[in-house]
């Protein structure tokens, strides 16, 4: 089984590219979605996050309010590190459980924001970086409902995209049309599934 990392900065279109790979036949796992699923009541991560950050992060129904949690951790490096420690430990266990059950000829892709920053890209056979310039990323994030301030804060926590592409085995330029992006994705998919 080939294990591929897929990353890029906020607003660059990682999820769009991941969906294209999924449609072509890859098994794609979205790290953010998986981590968000850990926040449901009863999950050990939920318990540990509430114990660590307090009940102030909960909404009226007792669910973790991700916006409240983000407001806390993105303003304090130590708290962010603690949250990542809790969630990433569970994430890696889950990835191992999932990949153990996949067939040998599966193209497994993990979509995750911080593969380069955390050094975990080294655990994968190849790294794909989705690229789009700052202004395009900002516009996309704001269109999705993110505030400009929140975008800036998150953008600054990530390695500059121009630096991140230096780690890539493949770069998908997602600043053009959907058709242009799809052509690049298809080419990369064909290369990854052709090579032994």
Swiss-Prot record:
Gene Ontology terms: biological process: coenzyme A biosynthetic process
Residue intervals passing through the bilayer: none
Binding residue positions for ATP: 11-16
Keyword entries, A-Z: ATP-binding, Coenzyme A biosynthesis, Cytoplasm, Kinase, Nucleotide-binding, Transferase
Keyword Lyase applies: no
MF annotations from Gene Ontology: ATP binding; dephospho-CoA kinase activity
Pathway involvement of the protein, from the record: Cofactor biosynthesis; coenzyme A biosynthesis; CoA from (R)-pantothenate: step 5/5
Residue stretches making up the DPCK domain: 3-196
EC number: 2.7.1.24
GO terms under cellular component: cytoplasm
InterPro entries, per the entry: Depp_CoAkinase, P-loop_NTPase
Catalytic activity: 3'-dephospho-CoA + ATP = ADP + CoA + H(+)
Statement: the UniProt record of this protein carries the keyword Ion transport: no
Cell compartments where the protein resides: Cytoplasm
Pfam families (alphabetical): CoaE
Biological function: Catalyzes the phosphorylation of the 3'-hydroxyl group of dephosphocoenzyme A to form coenzyme A.
Alphabetical list of NCBIfam families matching this protein: dephospho-CoA kinase (TIGR00152)
PANTHER family reported in the protein's UniProt record: BIFUNCTIONAL COENZYME A SYNTHASE-RELATED, DEPHOSPHO-COA KINASE-RELATED
UniProt similarity note: Belongs to the CoaE family.
Name of the molecule in the record: Dephospho-CoA kinase
Natural source organism: Aquifex aeolicus (strain VF5)
Gene, per the UniProt record: coaE
